[in-house]
């Protein structure tokens, strides 16, 4: 990502603040989701609905719809990304239901490594020693976190929440790879189309009775995940991208999981054991290694950049 030389220091400072705020908000979504008292499908449905309405209003109010360059290929690819994105959210929130936010978020951040692995398969991208090392380190870290051993059954694995976090990471990786081919539509439009698709495809799975017993506090958390964690945060995120260097973004994205882990340990009292702690460190060390390969490069997708992980 090349910075415009005409960017002023004030613009850059403002962009840094926006990016930091967006990463902090992204990092708090696990904490918010645990206080919604909604299952994953219903929570993602509300998130998609609120985000679609909010981003649609901003898109129309700003007049940006007048400058969009529509193409059938981009729209179809955006919708395909939207399918994977929506179920990425479903699986992520499902993992929050079954395990701690710390464990779920750590495993979820396998996504950049999975992009490397899948990219080598689908796009014939060569893996160097650093890439292979990062993949091995991350998967060993995942094994330590999940406590997998010779006696671990499929039922135990499914009930641990780890499998849902892995599926969320896998679907995010597919979202990233598909998003590389979207060139003409703006990030606001792609996100609007994807969340709108989410509303449509999730309706058959929604149990509306789940909303009947929500308290006022639950509703505040529910609406926040849609408007703040999806709508407002994307405005902050995308508005700051073009003013910041790839190197800075590569570093600041670690603020997202850091906030999630701090909130989980402070407010829920979760304490990972020695092996889980080692696994968490290994996953983020492996993720950091992937940045060595991609330093100086950034491809903006419907959800962010290929060097970055957001919820």
Swiss-Prot record:
The keyword Magnesium does not apply. It holds the Pfam family EamA. The keyword Lyase does not apply. One of its GO terms (cellular component) is membrane. Gene3D superfamilies: 1.10.3730.20. Residues 24-147, 166-292 form the EamA domain. It is found in: Cell membrane. It comes from the Bacteria. Its main location: membrane. The chain crosses the membrane at residues 13-33, 41-61, 76-96, 103-123, 128-148, 157-177, 192-212, 218-238, 248-268, 272-292. Keywords: Cell membrane, Membrane, Repeat, Transmembrane, Transmembrane helix, Transport. It is a multi-pass membrane protein. Belongs to the EamA transporter family. This is Uncharacterized transporter YxxF. It comes from Bacillus subtilis (strain 168).
């Amino acid at each position: 990502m090349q910075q415009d030389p005409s960017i002023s220091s004030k613009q850059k400072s403002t962009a840094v603040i926006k990016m930091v705020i967006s990463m902090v908000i992204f990092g708090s979504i696990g904490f918010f989701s645990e206080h919604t008292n909604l299952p994953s499908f219903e929570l993602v449905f509300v998130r998609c609905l609120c985000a679609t309405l909010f981003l649609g209003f901003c898109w129309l109010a700003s007049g940006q719809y007048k400058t969009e360059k529509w193409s059938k290929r981009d729209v179809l690819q955006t919708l395909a990304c939207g399918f994977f994105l929506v179920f990425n959210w479903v699986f992520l929130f499902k993992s929050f239901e079954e395990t701690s936010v710390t464990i779920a978020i750590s495993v979820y951040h396998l996504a950049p490594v999975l992009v490397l692995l899948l990219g080598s398969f689908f796009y014939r991208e060569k893996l160097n020693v650093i890439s292979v090392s990062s993949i091995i380190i991350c998967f060993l870290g995942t094994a330590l976190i999940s406590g997998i051993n010779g006696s671990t059954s499929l039922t135990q694995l499914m009930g641990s929440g780890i499998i849902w976090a892995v599926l969320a990471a896998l679907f995010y990786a597919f979202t990233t790879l598909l998003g590389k081919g979207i060139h003409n539509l703006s990030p606001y439009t792609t996100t609007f189309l994807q969340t709108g698709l989410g509303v449509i495809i999730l309706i058959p799975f929604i149990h509306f009775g789940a909303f009947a017993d929500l308290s006022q506090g639950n509703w505040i958390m529910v609406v926040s995940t849609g408007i703040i964690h999806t709508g407002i945060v994307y405005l902050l995120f995308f508005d700051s991208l073009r003013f910041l260097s790839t190197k800075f973004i590569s570093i600041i994205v670690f603020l997202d999981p850091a906030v999630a882990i701090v909130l989980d340990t402070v407010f829920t009292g979760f304490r990972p054991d020695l092996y889980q702690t080692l696994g968490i460190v290994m996953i983020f060390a492996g993720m950091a290694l992937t940045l060595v390969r991609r330093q100086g490069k950034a491809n903006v997708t419907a959800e962010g950049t290929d060097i970055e992980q957001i919820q």
